[in-house]
From Swiss-Prot:
Molecular functions per Gene Ontology: ribosome binding
The organism's place on the tree of life at top rank: Bacteria
UniProt-listed Pfam families: PRC_RimM, RimM
PANTHER family: RIBOSOME MATURATION FACTOR RIMM
Cellular localization per UniProt: Cytoplasm
InterPro entries: PRC_barrel-like_sf (IPR011033), PRC_RimM (IPR056792), RimM (IPR011961), RimM_N (IPR002676), RimM_N_sf (IPR036976), Transl_B-barrel_sf (IPR009000)
Function: An accessory protein needed during the final step in the assembly of 30S ribosomal subunit, possibly for assembly of the head region. Essential for efficient processing of 16S rRNA. May be needed both before and after RbfA during the maturation of 16S rRNA. It has affinity for free ribosomal 30S subunits but not for 70S ribosomes.
Protein keywords: Chaperone, Cytoplasm, Ribosome biogenesis, rRNA processing
Comment block on domains: The PRC barrel domain binds ribosomal protein uS19.
Disulfide cysteine pairs (residue numbers): none
Single GO cellular component term: cytoplasm
Entry protein name: Ribosome maturation factor RimM
Gene from which the chain derives: rimM
UniProt main location, coarse: cytoplasm
């Protein structure tokens, strides 16, 4: 399964640097000089491999220079490109209470009382912590803080998450 680890937002400057939204918990390990990235263009087309020349932080994004991307026009052509990795390449997680986002997405969510809540559509990473965006069958979405006081259990084997929501959380 392909996982998105970054997305090209725009060109930065005139020398071909790219402003990239990072979507990995290991940016220092994944976005380093010499690393090879697999890119999928936003507007279709064939995937390509890119070699990183340099990386630097810029606010909440990274500025990345790729081999062969030497000016603003070449960088603009990559706008929207998704950088991907195969989930099989990810190292196993040793902590039983930690999960990769893709492991949680698609899981069924129910309360400790057995009431179905919905399915995890996305894991959101915020400054305050992680949130599970849970979508019900009608398409309504509720955000559930991914904290032990609310998320009682996660079963990869059963593809299920059990929550004990505080009063009113599911009514928002």
């Amino acid at each position: 399964m392909d996982l998105v680890v970054g997305r090209v937002v725009k060109a930065h400057g005139v020398t071909g640097e790219l402003a990239v939204d990072v979507r990995t918990d290991d940016p220092e390990g994944r976005f380093v000089a010499g690393a090879v990235l697999r890119g999928r263009p936003a507007r279709g087309g064939a995937e390509r491999e890119f070699v990183i020349e340099s990386v630097r932080s810029h606010g909440d994004r990274m500025l990345i220079r790729l081999q062969g991307v030497g000016d603003r026009d070449a960088a603009d052509a990559l706008r929207g490109t998704l950088f991907l990795v195969d989930s099989a390449e990810l190292p196993p997680i040793e902590d039983p209470d930690e999960f990769y986002d893709h492991q949680l997405e698609g899981m069924a969510v129910s309360t400790t009382g057995g009431q179905p809540v919905g399915t995890v559509a996305e894991v959101l990473h915020t400054a305050a912590g992680e949130l599970l965006a849970v979508r019900d069958p009608d398409g309504a979405e509720v955000l559930v803080p991914f904290v032990s006081a609310i998320v009682v259990s996660v079963s990869l084997a059963d593809n299920a998450i059990e929550i004990d929501p505080p009063e009113g959380l599911l009514d928002l």
